[in-house]
């Protein structure tokens, strides 16, 4: 929208020492059956007030939260709290109170109560910026019928299988150009390999990809000279995420009132995002109006305008949100995926073998290849299990429900701790191991309501299909052309910057696998 972040069991224990005797079942909560209705009791539910909690004084809780410097390690804090309180707990920080759950069956039950218009938690500083500066909003912030109206239109243009097929010829050349970029770096280093941190290159790749899908035009982000205006947009998205965390726990009005530097930086980042997105949209909008025929798919913007199912202001708002959400999220997941493959060379070879076999069987047809790489697609799920973009998935249930024998009132903020779930041995065997095959087993109970990296249901990530296609194509071309290794042996942990990011640079080595790149 992020070890692996706790790379080894020893690192997990070091970061989160066991608070209860976990025995064989995980972190202090009992393992519950995974059949239909598991964990849902017919007994009279206990009241909400009895849900385990560190205390009801949100300001004292917030003081301890800050004292322990928990802001950037909130995902570890979730693990600690589940160790201490069991599979459900509530916590109040400042004015915000949430119920946290971890069990997949509880998640499945929660989603039955999300209603026709599911609501997620709105990031306070984001919402405050949009409201105070009267910025147009898209599906990220819209509610009820207004959200549904936009979402139905976007689903047709962004999520439908027919639409996804149109994106392949736009995204595939970007991945091929990234391979060319790495080959050029290998030549420049003159050692037969390239070693370094490619985080910025992945940002460029992700922005080049999402803008090509949106506008049907390339910006040239992978060329020798990077577009300076586009770089400003990328930098602004990065700053927007990183300035969000310090603004989460107090009312944004306070930061605005005192004009704190963090708030000013946050506003400046959003201003740049809106200004650049508006400029791009207007340029391509005017260009599209002058054309009557297109040799290739002209992009999502054109189809949204052509359908006339959205007002122009709504089109611009949703394009802005998809552009902002399509840079750090995708690039960070790809960085983690490369990291995992570099640490698990046997898995990397399995993935490469599948890709090469698919290339031969499909005779170079990339569309056919995409249907023949189930392990590679599973590896993306596995990366998101270990390194989810978001640490929680949130819902406000439409009516009262019972979870773990506790009554949860309607409109209570319930957060699914997906990072903690992904690290729990009660739900994933050998949870620290990068094992894509776990997603391909025949026992569906083993993956039931566990694949939540893109959210779930009608309010899942609107850019999910674009991101999945973009990452799959990228990994196909990388695996065909390079062997990936770690430059330095060592674990990389995670920090919470609204999305989960590495706590230090990831240095990788790319060695040519073939001298001649495969033909598309």
From Swiss-Prot:
InterPro entries: CYP11_CYP27_families, Cyt_P450, Cyt_P450_CS, Cyt_P450_E_grp-I, Cyt_P450_sf
Family, per entry: Belongs to the cytochrome P450 family.
Cofactor: heme
Enzyme Commission number(s) from the entry: 1.14.15.6
Chain positions covered by the region annotation Disordered: 27-48
Function: A cytochrome P450 monooxygenase that catalyzes the side-chain hydroxylation and cleavage of cholesterol to pregnenolone, the precursor of most steroid hormones. Catalyzes three sequential oxidation reactions of cholesterol, namely the hydroxylation at C22 followed with the hydroxylation at C20 to yield 20R,22R-hydroxycholesterol that is further cleaved between C20 and C22 to yield the C21-steroid pregnenolone and 4-methylpentanal. Mechanistically, uses molecular oxygen inserting one oxygen atom into a substrate and reducing the second into a water molecule.
Reactions catalysed according to its record: 6 reduced [adrenodoxin] + cholesterol + 3 O2 + 6 H(+) = 4-methylpentanal + pregnenolone + 6 oxidized [adrenodoxin] + 4 H2O; 2 reduced [adrenodoxin] + cholesterol + O2 + 2 H(+) = (22R)-hydroxycholesterol + 2 oxidized [adrenodoxin] + H2O; (22R)-hydroxycholesterol + 2 reduced [adrenodoxin] + O2 + 2 H(+) = (20R,22R)-20,22-dihydroxycholesterol + 2 oxidized [adrenodoxin] + H2O; (20R,22R)-20,22-dihydroxycholesterol + 2 reduced [adrenodoxin] + O2 + 2 H(+) = 4-methylpentanal + pregnenolone + 2 oxidized [adrenodoxin] + 2 H2O
PROSITE patterns from the UniProt entry: CYTOCHROME_P450
GO molecular function, a single term: heme binding
Gene3D superfamilies, sorted: Cytochrome P450 (1.10.630.10)
Keyword annotations: Cholesterol metabolism, Heme, Iron, Lipid metabolism, Membrane, Metal-binding, Mitochondrion, Mitochondrion inner membrane, Monooxygenase, Oxidoreductase, Steroid metabolism, Steroidogenesis, Sterol metabolism, Transit peptide
Topological category with respect to the lipid bilayer: Peripheral membrane protein
Binding locations of heme: 461
Quaternary structure note: Interacts with FDX1/adrenodoxin.
Disulfide bonds: none
Biological process per Gene Ontology, one example term: C21-steroid hormone biosynthetic process
Listed name of the protein: Cholesterol side-chain cleavage enzyme, mitochondrial
Superkingdom of the source species: Eukaryota
A GO cellular component entry from the record: mitochondrial inner membrane
Transit peptide range per the UniProt entry: 1-39
